[in-house]
Regions:
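Structural beta-sheet core signal
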Residues: 7, 30, 105-107, 140, ...
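Rossmann-like NAD(P)(H) cofactor-binding subdomain of soluble oxidoreductases
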Residues: 56, 63-155, 171
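Internal alpha-helical scaffold of NAD(P)-dependent oxidoreductase catalytic cores
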Residues: 129-137, 155-253
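NAD(P)-dependent Rossmann-like dehydrogenase/reductase catalytic/cofactor-binding core
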Residues: 198, 205-213, 230-237, 241, ...
Length: 356
């Protein structure tokens, strides 16, 4: 393609996507907030902080000046965590190629963003900040994937969702390879809602998984098993569908394909999942003990040492449930745990009792 690509965000997922594209011979620059990370990518062709053990292509270079990274690029991929995404977008608004609509913009960030009337999907929020010609042309990329696997060439599938068929296809060809399969979707709202909401379910799944494997040390009793996890997974998928429809999803198959059940499954079950890991840490390491409530946890999230997107999403999902009058007990229960209103074991018993 001979594409000029910028990836804004040098975390694990941004680095993995940049590696895939650079590995196809494209001109790729990645923007890093941290000078140390940029120096390591350029000098040692690695990113030991976010993607240890992965060798990066020599034609992939890093910069710390965001306008240098974004300027004159044909493709721009936003990879900052949801907490920092709007700040990243505001920094590129003065870039001429962005201001003049010469760049196709894709987003790989998962989550919701705050709005004046409550939480919003990522693309609809970004459209308010970007020039008007980007409306209905942004591309959202999601699917059952982990940076640790994609960067090592494990076969994986992604969804390229956009109201612009042309731009969806352009990103498909930019990303796809023999080991990375990319499919198109026009249900942009459904794909975004599923990608954000599944992180909340994954934290609950991680708690259950920890209780299942260490029940004797928690006082929960040896009552949780693989079948219990399947109950939670199925009920969680139903909650994602309920929320997605309320937010404007247009296709039922969005939730039965890789953007729905596929993404939920890998997020819940993979050892690489940060949300699953956080759920396990709630049980095994009592990681919530230093925090008074969810707001305190979010404001001090850096103390965790990694960023589970489901923590931020839980607050937004709770607000959306109230706005749309939705019954989504797993998501609300998880919010109450993070807000220090209830204990994990009690939540799981309440959830199971609610199924009877």
């Amino acid at each position: 393609m001979n594409a000029r690509v910028a990836v804004l965000g040098a975390g694990a997922w941004g680095t993995a996507v940049a590696k895939v594209i650079a590995g196809k011979g494209e001109d790729v620059v990645i923007w890093s907030r941290e000078a140390e990370t940029a120096a390591e990518i350029n000098g040692g062709h690695g990113n030991s902080r976010f993607l240890p053990g992965v060798k990066l292509p020599e034609n992939m270079r890093a910069v710390t000046d965001i306008t240098e990274a974004a300027g004159g690029r044909e493709f721009l991929i936003l990879a900052a965590p949801s907490l920092y995404l709007l700040d990243t977008v505001k920094q590129i608004l003065a870039v001429p190629s962005i201001r003049e609509g010469e760049t196709v913009i894709g987003v790989i960030t998962k989550g919701f963003l705050p709005g004046s009337k409550g939480p919003r999907l990522i693309l609809e929020t970004l459209e308010d900040y970007l020039p008007g010609f980007y409306r209905k042309s942004l591309v959202y990329i999601a699917g059952p994937s982990h940076a640790e696997e994609v960067s090592r060439g494990k076969i994986t599938g992604l969804i390229s969702a956009s109201e612009s068929a042309k731009n969806s296809i352009r990103f498909r060809y930019l990303l796809k390879s023999n080991r990375l399969l990319v499919f198109s979707s026009f249900d942009v709202r459904g794909v975004q809602a599923a990608a954000a909401a599944k992180n909340v379910i994954a934290i609950a799944f991680g708690m259950l998984d920890a209780l299942k494997t260490a029940a004797g040390n928690t006082g929960a009793g040896d009552i949780f098993g693989d079948g219990t996890e399947s109950l939670l997974l199925a009920a969680g998928l139903n909650e994602i569908q309920i929320l997605g429809r309320a937010m404007g999803a247009t296709h039922a198959e969005t939730f039965t394909s890789i953007s729905g059940v596929g993404d939920l499954d890998v997020t819940c079950r993979s050892v690489f999942g940060r949300n699953r890991r956080f759920g396990r840490d709630i049980i095994e390491k009592h990681i919530l003990n230093p925090f008074r409530n969810l707001d305190d946890l979010i404001s001090r999230i850096g103390e965790i040492g990694y960023l589970p997107e489901g923590v931020v999403a839980a607050r937004h999902v709770k607000t959306l449930a109230e706005k749309y009058k939705l019954r989504i007990p797993i998501s609300i229960g998880l919010y109450r745990i993070l807000n220090r209103e209830t204990e994990p074991v009690q939540f799981l018993h309440d959830f199971l009792n609610g199924l009877r």
